[in-house]
């Protein structure tokens, strides 16, 4: 139940093989794109299979993976168009995550806590929200990943909206300790989010934010190759800073 939106919210939770309630596992939150839901990253992109295989062969740490539903509106159950009102509902997920979902996970599962043990990764709109979360809550999240993050993290105009921005360009910076990892990637032929991911990279570079940025040659927005690449590379490094 979410006090943020006043209703029950769906979520998928992937537990490690041989999950042991007496152990504590780091937690990765995986965020979907616009018009999608808690099933999309599994059904369309097989993110759960990629991560499970990586854990099995030792290329990723054992972890709990949480696939939430991001559209956090009190009035609507689903996104019905690209409007500022609907985008604000995706932004409101940040409140739902910190206020309701994280305490639920930490109370009901063998979840390790603290920024050393908490990561967020997202695709498209989910990538934008993952970056916002990383800059807003550096004390809670130590690992931030974004594949093809959508417009609107900072003020800007795209083909659909004039985005007011969740943060200013100057706010894409840290006055305290940075996360252990910020990774962004995108196809270099992305016709949906265009050059916005690269713009975020350039702003972070200008602001002295240590991060990894790369492009996947010839790949578009919904490319299996691009999404699986960023997922794989992020999960190789997550929870391994110490």
Language-model segments: which ranges?
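Non-catalytic cap/lid and distal C-terminal segments of serine-dependent acyl enzymes
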Residues: 1-242
